[in-house]
Amino acid sequence: MIDVMQIQEILPHRYPFLLVDKITELKVKEVVLGYKNISISDHVFMGHFPGHPIYPGVLILEGMAQTGGVLAFESMEDKVDPKSKVVYFTGIDGAKFRNPVRPGDRLDYEMSVVKNRGNMWIFKGQAFVDGNLVAEAELKAMIVDK
């Protein structure tokens, strides 16, 4: 497992935009599982939507991308200092939002490698709440020097 403090050693994101709390499983160049606990105290709920809080789909996608970023960094053959690199989210295909995500939910991410060539990555991403699919997409990313 990789906890949030270790995630911050890998990714440059910080509160309020670090959207993965823990990595629970990681198989190099294959798959990563992680999650974010959705809390009513998340700033996004001040405006999305007052009286009817729904976690934004775009943030679900960003959390998926960050989870995939951890997998990409941990899968690099030449172990480099992640502080000298950054993962850029370069594309998205087939994004679908199936069910709303609400405060109190645990948002589980599953990112599987579709293709990796050098610093380029394509992931199949899925997000779940209580085992139910809430979002899916194919995400593309690349690792570059800062």
Swiss-Prot record:
InterPro entries: FabA_FabZ, FabZ, HotDog_dom_sf. The lineage of its organism: Bacteria, Pseudomonadati, Campylobacterota, Epsilonproteobacteria, Campylobacterales. Keywords: Cytoplasm, Lipid A biosynthesis, Lipid biosynthesis, Lipid metabolism, Lyase. It is found in: Cytoplasm. The active site is at H48. Involved in unsaturated fatty acids biosynthesis. Catalyzes the dehydration of short chain beta-hydroxyacyl-ACPs and long chain saturated and unsaturated beta-hydroxyacyl-ACPs. One of its GO terms (cellular component) is cytoplasm. It comes from the Bacteria. One of its GO terms (molecular function) is (3R)-hydroxyacyl-[acyl-carrier-protein] dehydratase activity. GO terms for biological process: fatty acid biosynthetic process; lipid A biosynthetic process. Belongs to the thioester dehydratase family. FabZ subfamily. Its EC number is 4.2.1.59. Gene3D superfamilies: Hotdog Thioesterase. It catalyses: a (3R)-hydroxyacyl-[ACP] = a (2E)-enoyl-[ACP] + H2O. This is 3-hydroxyacyl-[acyl-carrier-protein] dehydratase FabZ. Pfam families: FabA. Its main location: cytoplasm. HAMAP family: FabZ.
